[in-house]
């Protein structure tokens, strides 16, 4: 989830941009998403956390218990009823990597094509010809991504069948399973867009704007941190980050002026909080798929994740407070990354004292 949240070529980008499209932001939905990436502290700090933890070679919380158990006894706590999947001797690493690379390349090409990079865009204009960044900002993710997905799917089927990794019959049997897996996200996105329309029709944006108009500048600067915490709680309780986008993004755009840097920071805080809550929620589809893929007990997976997630989230709160006041991405990064490393050093010191 943290990776998808900062990837412009993903269904998550489409979810955020579609929710923000048509709101009073002054830019397109995909442009808003791209501008929000540098301030998405949860995703960025998660990478820092993982890399630092790997180099420092320690664990804490329930994860430490399970890691020690695995090292000493070899017990990986695999599910007892997990099915033993037959290993295909014909499969190679390239069979996984090549379709993914084709998907990325074709989706990128599809999005800049719709945005007008190669000439006339989907809207009939020619302003973005040869302008990669401009074409990305002018694109419609819901037009570009499906074409990329369809072409990549066709390539994958032809490639794997030609290599005789799977039969054509097996390939066709996988397609309905893929459609079934996407029913829930599509329904969530549809309901989120409907909720956005309802909020707009009720005039919630006008109410929130009037409510915040007389607020002190200090309160405005603290709002990104508040938005992050609210998004965390909402996503954790509901188990869906996409639904959180639909609820909070229209409210965030009503709070901050379209030309304000705080609007970008607020959207980033919303996205970061939604991913954080979704990341550790026991009813989240991403958590369920992660535990199922690792063949471990679902509640044990959630229990081992929560201390790590809360550590990153705590640093994010401080980071968004700093971002709200300084409104400078480089200062925000410096403070957040330094604090993340300091927190890990302190935790490692505490764990060593416990072990002594």
Predicted feature residues:
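Alpha-helical transmembrane segments and, especially, the helix-loop junctions at the ends
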Residues: 1-63, 234-246, 267-293, 304, ...
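Selective recognition of specific alpha-helical transmembrane segments in multi-pass small-molecule
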Residues: 3-5, 90-110, 151, 180-196, ...
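Transmembrane helix-loop junctions in multi-pass membrane proteins
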Residues: 18-26, 59, 108-121, 161-168, ...
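Long, contiguous bundles of hydrophobic transmembrane helices that form the permeation core
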Residues: 31-33, 46-138, 150-174, 297-306, ...
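Membrane-interfacial loop-to-helix junctions in multi-pass transporters
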Residues: 39-41, 92-95, 145-146, 179-185, ...
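Alpha-helical transmembrane segments of multipass membrane proteins
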Residues: 51, 104, 108, 157-158, ...
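Helix-loop-helix junctions that connect adjacent transmembrane helices in secondary transporters/permeases
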Residues: 156-233
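Hydrophobic alpha-helical transmembrane segments of multi-pass integral membrane proteins
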Residues: 186-192, 217-259, 263-264, 270-278
């Amino acid at each position: 989830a943290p990776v998808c949240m900062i990837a412009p070529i993903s269904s998550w980008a489409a979810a955020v941009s579609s929710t923000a499209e048509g709101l009073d932001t002054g830019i397109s939905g995909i442009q808003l998403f791209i501008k929000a990436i540098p301030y998405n502290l949860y995703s960025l700090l998660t990478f820092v956390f993982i890399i630092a933890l790997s180099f420092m070679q320690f664990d804490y919380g329930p994860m430490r218990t399970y890691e020690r158990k695995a090292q000493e006894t070899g017990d990986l706590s695999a599910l007892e009823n997990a099915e033993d999947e037959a290993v295909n001797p014909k499969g190679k690493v390239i069979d996984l990597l090549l379709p993914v690379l084709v998907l990325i390349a074709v989706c990128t090409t599809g999005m800049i094509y719709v945005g007008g990079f190669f000439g006339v865009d989907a809207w009939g204009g020619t302003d973005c010809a040869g302008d990669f960044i401009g074409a990305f900002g002018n694109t419609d993710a819901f037009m570009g991504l499906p074409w990329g997905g369809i072409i990549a799917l066709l390539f994958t089927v032809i490639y794997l069948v030609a290599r005789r990794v799977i039969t054509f019959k097996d390939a066709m049997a996988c397609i309905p399973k893929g459609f079934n897996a996407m029913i829930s996200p599509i329904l969530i996105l549809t309901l989120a867009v409907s909720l956005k329309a309802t909020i707009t029709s009720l005039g919630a944006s006008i109410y929130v704007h009037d409510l915040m108009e007389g607020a002190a500048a200090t309160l405005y600067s603290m709002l990104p941190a508040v938005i992050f915490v609210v998004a965390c709680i909402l996503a954790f309780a509901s188990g869906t980050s996409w639904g959180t986008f639909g609820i909070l993004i229209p409210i965030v755009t009503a709070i901050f002026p379209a030309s304000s840097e705080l609007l970008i920071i607020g959207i980033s805080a919303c996205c970061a909080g939604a991913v954080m809550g979704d990341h550790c929620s026991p009813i989240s589809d991403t958590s369920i798929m992660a535990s199922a893929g690792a063949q471990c007990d679902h509640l044990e997976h959630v229990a081992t994740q929560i201390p790590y997630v809360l550590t990153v989230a705590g640093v994010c709160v401080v980071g968004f407070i700093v971002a709200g006041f300084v409104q400078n991405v480089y200062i925000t990064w410096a403070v957040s990354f330094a604090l993340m490393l300091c927190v890990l050093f302190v935790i490692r010191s505490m764990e060593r004292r416990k072990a002594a």
